[in-house]
Design a protein with these regions (language model features):
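Small-residue-rich transmembrane alpha-helices that serve as helix-helix interface/gating elements
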Residues: 88-93, 152-167
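Short, strongly hydrophobic alpha-helical membrane anchors
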Residues: 1-18
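Hydrophobic alpha-helical transmembrane segments in multi-pass integral membrane proteins
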Residues: 68-75, 128-146
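Juxtamembrane helix-loop boundaries in multi-pass membrane proteins
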Residues: 15-17, 21-25, 48-70, 113-131, ...
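Membrane-water interface of transmembrane alpha-helices
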Residues: 30-42, 93-109, 173
């Protein structure tokens, strides 16, 4: 490490300070809304498979938001090593959590042929495993090369991806695309 390298690394993460603060706040707010949405939506559905699907989707959205929240909060303490370590830990936690959620959804038949949203369920599971694996690999690479601004930027973009993934799952949990207002009847 050259004499000015530590300052460059600190400056790079400093460029994202506002992003990390906003990310922590946004993920906490969306987590609260997600809990309310799941409570409301699951209360009116008697189908166990649909409830399990929603629970798995909400759980995976929850994992993504918790990942973004903790990585962002810890990143505010500064340093590429801290940022890399928080990404590493959260990626491992989320991979284990995703494995558990997928197992439950599989037992409930959410990946069975003929299940109405089978392809979407498989896509969400694949995106989760892939995204957290990418986060894990980038975190390991950053810990090996803490001066790499490209790796730091890539991990910041992973956080953006986590938000997108969580919002897509939360949208699907609510069932908004499938719920339509009744057609008006002419009187």
């Amino acid at each position: 490490m050259q004499p000015g390298d530590a300052r460059k690394v600190a400056l790079l993460l400093g460029h994202y300070e506002m992003f990390f603060a906003a990310s922590a706040g946004a993920s906490a707010a969306i987590l609260g809304l997600l809990v309310v949405a799941v409570s409301v939506v699951n209360s009116d559905d008697a189908d166990a498979k649909t409830r399990e699907r929603r629970t798995a989707l909400a759980g995976s959205a929850f994992l993504a938001l918790v990942d973004a929240f903790f990585v962002s909060i810890v990143a505010l303490t500064g340093g590429a090593t801290v940022f890399g370590t928080s990404n590493l830990v959260m990626a491992m936690v989320c991979l284990l959590g995703t494995r558990s959620l997928v197992s439950g959804a599989k037992r409930a038949g959410n990946f069975s042929r003929g299940f109405p949203t089978r392809r979407l369920n498989i896509a969400f599971a694949t995106i989760s495993f892939g995204g957290y694996s990418i986060q894990l690999g980038l975190a390991i690479a950053l810990l090996a090369d803490a001066q790499s601004s490209a790796l730091q930027r890539a991990l910041v973009l992973v956080l953006v991806g986590l938000f997108g993934s969580a919002l897509a799952r939360a949208w699907e949990v609510t069932g908004i695309p499938r719920r339509r207002l009744p057609e008006p009847t002419d009187r």
